[in-house]
Amino acid sequence: PEVDEYLRRQSMSAVDYKAFVERLKKELPGEPILIVRFGDHQPSFAKHMVDPALDDTVLARRIAEADPRFLATYYAIEGINFKPASLSSALDTLDAPYLPIVVMEAAGLPLDPSFAEQKRVMKRCNGLFYRCAAGAEAKRFNRLLIEAGLIKRL
């Protein structure tokens, strides 16, 4: 039943996405549009297919350790009346905190100093954020944002 429901929803999503793109083209003819889709995990039933012998405790540990068999980021970038300016930051592995960099560069927008620094972290860490250097890079970057006054009231 879980797999059937997943496939049903995937089918609905594909139909809805196609209708969404067609509506954008109709309502905004000639306008440049950048669409980004993002996800970061396998469907819940995947655990039974990937390694059915795992109990919930071991599975939870594997997910917490970011085992790529259970936790994998995916994203897609599509332009309508628009060719993405740069996809140089579109790495195979890309944690969610870096997605704004990819979107801004694809849209042809300049990176402000905080995003430029985050891009340097992204390159150093090969697309990982919290899992890079046992979290040290994320802590350092977030500390920079706090000290710059960009993150407040923690």
Per-range role (PLM):
Residues P1-L154:
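Solvent-exposed soluble domains appended to multi-pass membrane proteins
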